[in-house]
């Protein structure tokens, strides 16, 4: 395989999809050496088959707002690869959603799900609809209209969506209710459900908790204790909230959180009481993070991200490409020695190069934030056997999965000088499992 040639061909065939191109380039550049040890892969054009989704559904979503006006949005579902299990990946509702972003997310999801060792393929879906500023009734009407098309393409053994940005328990509940009505069956077709109707304990916390469990494994490789360390967290949604919660439990000091308008810097640290306020502000009132600064009298910086502040550890938990090369240099200059990604692809290629050249601990999202989909997989298992596990059981399984992912990254990513290239390790480990499954199943 010539990675540059494969990427050039994909850009020609699928122009105007920069996030998708970026994700493919990052993976190909790290697996090329291992791939070329297997000439049998090229004989069946494996890499092209793996880069291009199995299928893409694109549809119009028509719904009525509270004023009686008819609105239209675009809906999508990218079913990328099901070589190792049913398609599995979240649904994102955000004004920035387009096909290129969802193809990147589905591509990444394929390798992330492979890393968990659970039987899940990769997919992703969503819409350019944004729940922000919408009433509860409007969100329900949209979710029902969205599921009116999506339901025919998903199923517990076919494709199992979950939440993502803009899609929390409320939205999953609305979509599940509509699916149940259309399909005339109660089944585990969505994960992230409420506990009352098939959801799993620890699922809301899983991505944030899992990221910290992975971070702890990384820190062990350098004999570093997380207690007392100053942490920068971006975002204030589900992932960021539970990242902060686990950090507080472990004795770390979190000084930032953010949203799309700006970030807060609290030098005293965000404690349990302050985090409870943020959770209520964001989850119940759909408020803005600046209200935290007004309540607690700390610094608020509008229109910026929190990467200029001094800290030991950075945990980007908001969105893709939120850390660029210049941000990465500032983080290192300000003392950051570990970056663990809670969001999907939050660091640009230039930022990743800066981190790796500085030899700091850097964990890509496909490894570090795999906790969310791992517990989604555990929710699927509980649904299939019609049982619920305790919080302790699920949490222990999550810790074990994140430890195993870390071990796989170390196995495939340790370089001659001893530095662990977690990007390479995650990509090669995830790729090899999918590649072997595809080879065994023939040309399909």
Q: What do the PLM-derived regions correspond to, one by one?
A:
Residues 40-71:
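Structured beta-strand/loop patches that form or line metal/cofactor-binding pockets in enzymes
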Residues 21, 37-44, 117, 154-163, ...:
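Flexible, glycine/charged-enriched surface loops at secondary-structure junctions
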Residues 94, 113-227:
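Glycine/serine-rich phosphate-binding loop and adjoining beta1-alpha1 elements at the start
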Residues 262-362, 367:
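Rossmann-like adenosine-cofactor binding region
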Residues 1-23, 218, 317, 332-444:
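Adenosine-phosphate binding glycine-rich loop
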Residues 59-120, 124, 128:
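Phosphate-interaction motifs
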Residues 191-194, 199-310:
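Glycine-rich phosphate/diphosphate-binding loop of Rossmann-like nucleotide-binding domains
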């Amino acid at each position: 395989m010539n990675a540059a040639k494969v990427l050039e061909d994909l850009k020609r065939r699928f122009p105007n999809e920069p996030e998708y191109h970026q994700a493919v380039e990052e993976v190909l550049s790290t697996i090329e050496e291992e791939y070329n040890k297997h000439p049998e892969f090229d004989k069946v054009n494996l890499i092209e088959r793996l880069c291009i989704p199995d299928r893409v559904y694109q549809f119009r979503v028509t719904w009525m707002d509270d004023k009686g006006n008819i609105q239209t949005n675009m809906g999508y579902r990218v079913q990328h690869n099901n070589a190792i299990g049913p398609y599995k990946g979240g649904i994102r509702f955000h004004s920035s959603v387009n096909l290129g972003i969802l193809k990147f997310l589905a591509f990444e999801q394929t390798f992330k799900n492979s890393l968990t060792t659970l039987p899940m393929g990769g997919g992703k879906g969503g819409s350019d609809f944004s729940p922000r500023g919408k009433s509860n009734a409007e969100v329900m009407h949209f979710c029902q209209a969205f599921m009116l098309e999506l339901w025919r393409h998903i199923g517990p053994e076919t494709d199992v969506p979950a939440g993502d940005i803009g899609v929390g328990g409320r939205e999953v509940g609305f979509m599940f209710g509509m699916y149940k009505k259309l399909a005339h069956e109660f089944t585990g077709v969505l994960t992230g459900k409420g506990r009352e109707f098939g959801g799993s304990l620890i699922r809301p916390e899983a991505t944030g908790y899992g990221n910290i469990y992975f971070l702890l494994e990384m820190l062990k490789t350098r004999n570093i204790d997380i207690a007392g360390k100053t942490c920068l967290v971006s975002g204030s949604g589900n992932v960021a909230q539970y990242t902060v919660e686990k950090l507080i439990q472990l004795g770390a000091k979190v000084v930032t959180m953010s949203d799309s308008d700006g970030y807060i810097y609290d030098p005293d640290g965000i404690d349990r009481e302050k985090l409870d306020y943020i959770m209520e502000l964001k989850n119940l009132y759909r408020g803005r993070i600046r209200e935290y600064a007004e309540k607690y009298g700390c610094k608020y910086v509008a229109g910026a991200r929190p990467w200029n502040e001094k800290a030991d550890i950075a945990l980007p938990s908001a969105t893709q490409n939120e850390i660029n090369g210049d941000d990465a240099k500032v983080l290192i200059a300000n003392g950051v020695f570990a970056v663990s990604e809670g969001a999907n692809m939050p660091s640009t290629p230039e930022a990743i190069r800066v981190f790796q050249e500085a030899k700091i601990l850097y964990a890509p999202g496909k490894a570090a934030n795999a906790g969310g989909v791992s517990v989604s997989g555990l929710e699927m298992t509980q649904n299939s056997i019609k049982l619920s596990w305790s919080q302790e059981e699920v949490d222990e399984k999550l810790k074990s999965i994140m430890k195993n992912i870390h071990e796989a990254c170390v196995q495939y990513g340790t370089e001659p000088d001893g530095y662990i290239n977690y990007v390479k390790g995650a990509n090669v480990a995830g790729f090899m499992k999918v590649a072997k499954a595809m080879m065994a199943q023939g040309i399909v």
